[in-house]
Amino acid sequence: MNTNKRICIIYTGGTIGMVPSEHGYVPKAGVFEPLLRSINDIHRPEFPDWELVEFSPLLDSSNIAVGDWNKIGRVIDQRYDEFDGFVVLHGTDTMAYTASALSFMLENLNKPVVFTGSQIPLCMLRSDGLDNIVNAILIAASGRVHEVCLYFGGRLLRGNRSTKMSADLLEAFDSPNAPHLAETGIDIQYHDTVIRPK
């Protein structure tokens, strides 16, 4: 992995950053970066450099609107030349819709924009957020994809072909009518024949 790669992580809200409160798990401003820095893998020398942009207020993905899509697009546009790729952390309820919208909004894209999130908050035991965010960052830094996509539960999907299939399974998303762009296992296996050329 090229350690000079720079990835912009855009935290819009969602389950991945929720923390416990007297009312259950809730989103809370300012707590996600410490959670992110607690992940051992991101301190490895071969891991890409990254910078976090946190939305204020954090978005409830069940209430996301066109204006929120525009805001995400503007954040990417304003930082486009500074970074090699983007990871958008988003609630799962409408992640596929936002990824699809951004795929049409971001014209002539030649860098990866990878959406991800989690079914279990990052602060909890067994959180799927750990795998999802680490692999999403590595995919964004790989230079192998140049489009809006969605990584979740070991699958890299084309953003505008993805859909949420389960509210409970960790493999929550799929693209039933389109092949996966990649899968993760011991290695990240890219399917170059279905990835759009740069």
What is each of the regions a protein language model found here?
Residues 13-14, 87, 136, 154:
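Buried hydrophobic positions in well-ordered alpha/beta secondary-structure cores of metabolic enzymes
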